[in-house]
Amino acid sequence: MAKVQGKNAAEKENDDGLREKMIAVNRVSKVVKGGRTMSFAALTVVGDGDGRIGMGKGKAREVPVSVQKAMEQARRGMFKVALKNGTLYHTVVGKHGASTVLISPAAEGTGVIAGGPMRAIFEVMGVRNVVAKSLGSSNPYNMVRATLNGLRNSLTPSEVAAKRGKSVEEILG
């Protein structure tokens, strides 16, 4: 199983201003009557460095083709996360399958304190200060999905105020 994670993860910036990062490449096999058919499954994340993030997975007989498919899927599925000075507005919990991630905002100068696939997500998204903890399964796919689910559920103070029918000043105290 060839996994690419952490500092070794392939990262590049395109001419369209998007940062791409490959999180994992797995060799998978399909058993057929004539033997095993080998192919590769790639997991990637794409971000613009300003709060937009998307993840994709691609599968093909060759590694470059699977990575390319994953990048295309990630570009199509991008969504916006509200950031405040390079960090989040509040603590969020994300779940997917057996993976649970706890993501907390951090003060300026803290840096990205997160492991594995979560670090790649925050780097391409443009988050500079965050503390994240992975609980449960450390499967890269589940961790990425759990992180994105948590980020999707984050709200700005104005959104919280609108939900509660109060003003932003009342929410912030």
From Swiss-Prot:
All residue ranges annotated as the S5 DRBM domain in the record: 18-81
A GO MF label: rRNA binding
PROSITE patterns in UniProt: RIBOSOMAL_S5, S5_DSRBD
Annotated organism of origin: Bordetella avium (strain 197N)
Subunit structure: Part of the 30S ribosomal subunit. Contacts proteins S4 and S8.
Keyword Ribonucleoprotein: yes
Annotated Pfam families: Ribosomal_S5, Ribosomal_S5_C
Cross-referenced PANTHER family: MITOCHONDRIAL RIBOSOMAL PROTEIN S5 (PTHR48277:SF1)
Protein purpose: With S4 and S12 plays an important role in translational accuracy. Located at the back of the 30S subunit body where it stabilizes the conformation of the head with respect to the body.
GO cellular component: small ribosomal subunit
Any GO BP annotation: translation
Domain of life according to the entry: Bacteria
Domain notes: The N-terminal domain interacts with the head of the 30S subunit; the C-terminal domain interacts with the body and contacts protein S4. The interaction surface between S4 and S5 is involved in control of translational fidelity.
Key words of the record: Ribonucleoprotein, Ribosomal protein, RNA-binding, rRNA-binding
Name this protein carries in UniProt: Small ribosomal subunit protein uS5
Membrane spanning residue stretches: none
Family: Belongs to the universal ribosomal protein uS5 family.
S-S bridge residues: none
Isomerase among keywords: no
